[in-house]
């Protein structure tokens, strides 16, 4: 009985370790509008999302394109780094979040093609930087009790 209990405990702990890993994706949500500001309702659109290093015009550290469908309010949701993207450059876990500011550039083709229009670039804030915390376990610190 003790062996079965020990085995079940080990399996549970190993399973918990697997779930504690960062997923390597970023959520992004927006409302799609046409050139005069009208919401694109229930429409197939294409997005190109780019993460840039240091400045809004900085080096590309990640890029992907996606075909998405807006909802009745023009809202769309994507997960950068998840399956289903095309034209992918880099990986989300491969971005060096520890060095410098990161910016996300959003481009859209309201017709669902590949004629992208740049609709803006914004600096990323705290949450994506938490991906850097996944490497904190790699630190080796001397512990001297003196």
Sequence positions of predicted segments:
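Family-positioned intrinsically disordered, low-complexity linker/tail segments enriched in G/S/T/P
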Residues: 3-145
């Amino acid at each position: 009985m003790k062996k079965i209990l020990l085995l079940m405990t080990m399996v549970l702990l190993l399973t918990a370790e697997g779930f504690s890993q960062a997923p390597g994706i970023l959520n992004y949500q927006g409302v799609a509008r046409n050139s005069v500001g009208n919401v694109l309702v229930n429409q197939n659109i294409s997005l190109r999302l780019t993460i840039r290093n240091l400045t809004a015009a900085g080096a590309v550290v990640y890029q992907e394109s996606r075909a998405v469908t807006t909802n009745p309010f023009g809202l769309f949701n994507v997960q950068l780094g998840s399956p289903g993207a095309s034209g992918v450059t880099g990986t989300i876990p491969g971005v060096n979040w520890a060095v410098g500011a990161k910016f996300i550039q959003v481009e859209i083709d309201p017709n669902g093609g590949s004629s992208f229009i740049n609709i803006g670039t914004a600096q990323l804030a705290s949450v994506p930087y938490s991906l850097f915390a996944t490497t904190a376990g790699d630190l080796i610190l001397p512990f001297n009790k003196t």
